[in-house]
Amino acid sequence: MASASTQPAALSAEQAKVVLAEVIQAFSAPENAVRMDEARDNACNDMGKMLQFVLPVATQIQQEVIKAYGFSCDGEGVLKFARLVKSYEAQDPEIASLSGKLKALFLPPMTLPPHGPAAGGSVAAS
């Protein structure tokens, strides 16, 4: 019997939902919440620092969950899991929603620049 780490990780959409839910739940575990808060504090909403501090912690948290499902316990395993989830997002709104929730846990909110006349593009008449 081969070990889980040598088997390719192939999950159905239903299995992907279960794993996504487990990963999201792992972020709310007290020890992981503290690790993420510390990483966010160190990053100070700077995108470069987010990549330096937050992303590695988020990757480690995901690795701990997905290794039980046959993904390698490294960055490549997380990337493979992300690609698998992405492949199901268009077909399954629940997976798309869970994926969005997961990303929101470790990516800063993106603010779009304002558009149109209300954005200060026009000069007020006096």
UniProtKB/Swiss-Prot annotation:
Is Cell division one of the keywords UniProt gives this record? no
What name does this protein carry? Answer: Protein C10
| UniProt organism field | Homo sapiens
The subcellular location is: Cytoplasm
What family is this protein classified in?
Belongs to the UPF0456 family.
Q: Which gene encodes it?
A: C12orf57
Q: What is the lineage of its organism?
A: Eukaryota, Metazoa, Chordata, Craniata, Vertebrata
BP GO terms, sorted: camera-type eye morphogenesis; cognition; corpus callosum morphogenesis; post-embryonic development; psychomotor behavior; regulation of skeletal muscle contraction; third ventricle development
Q: Which UniProt keywords apply?
A: Acetylation, Cytoplasm, Disease variant, Intellectual disability
Report if keyword Transcription regulation is assigned: no
Task: Please provide an example of a Pfam family that matches this protein in its UniProt record.
Answer: P_C10
Q: Which InterPro entries match?
A: P_C10
Where is this chain primarily localised?
A: cytoplasm
Q: Which pathological condition is tied to this protein?
A: Temtamy syndrome: An autosomal recessive syndrome characterized by intellectual disability, variable craniofacial dysmorphism, ocular coloboma, seizures, and brain abnormalities, including abnormalities of the corpus callosum and thalamus.
